[in-house]
C-alpha cells in the first residue's frame, strides 16, 4: 500500500509539473483566441468603415477567409514535419508571420483593398496553423500521462477567454482611438504570442 501511495504521489507531482510547464502555452492560447476571433469578428467593420463598403459586401468578402485558412493547417503541419520542429516552435513562427502581415496591413493596406484582403487572409491563415499546433497536436504529447483531456480543455478554455476579450476589447479600442490602434494592438498580441511560445522551453524539454 505504501509503494502504491508513493507511485500515486509521484504521478500527481509529475502531472502538476507538466501543467505548470504549460503556463506560457496557456497564455499563448489566450493570445491566439484574441487574434483569431478579433480579426475575424472585426474585419467586416474595418472594411465597412475604411473603404465605405456596404455591410453585405464586407461580410461577403470575409466569407472567403475560412476556406483559405485550411491551407494554414496543412502548411504549418508540413513545416513542423519538414523541419522537425516542436509544436510550440511552429506556433511561434505562425504568430511571427501573422504579426509581419499585420504590420504590412497597417503600413501599406490602409488605402488598398487588395493588400488588406491579402493580409487579412495571411493573418487568419497563420492563426489556423497556430490553432492546430496548440489546441490539437500539442495536447497529444500528454496522452501517456493521462492528461490529454485536461490539457485539451485547459488550452481551449484559454482560447475562448481570448475570444471573449476580443469581442469587447477591440470594439472599444476602435471607437476610442480608431482602427490604427486596433492594428497596433494586433501586432502586439502577435509578438506576445510568439514570445510566449518561444518561452515554452519546459514543454519542449519534458515532451520533446
Stretches found by the model and what they are:
Residues 1-25:
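Juxtamembrane intracellular "pre-TM" segments in multi-pass secondary transporters
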Residues 18-77, 131, 135, 166:
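Extracytoplasmic gate region of multi-pass secondary transporters
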Residues 31, 64, 68, 122, ...:
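Small/hydrophobic positions within alpha-helical transmembrane segments
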Residues 54-62, 116, 148, 152:
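Juxtamembrane helix-start elements in MFS-like secondary transporters
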Residues 72-86, 174-175:
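Helix-to-loop junctions at the C-terminal end of transmembrane segments
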Residues 86-137:
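C-terminal transmembrane helical hairpin of 12-TM major facilitator-type secondary transporters
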Residues 105-107, 179, 184-208:
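Multi-pass alpha-helical transporter architecture, strongest
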Residues 142-177:
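A late C-terminal transmembrane helix in Major Facilitator Superfamily
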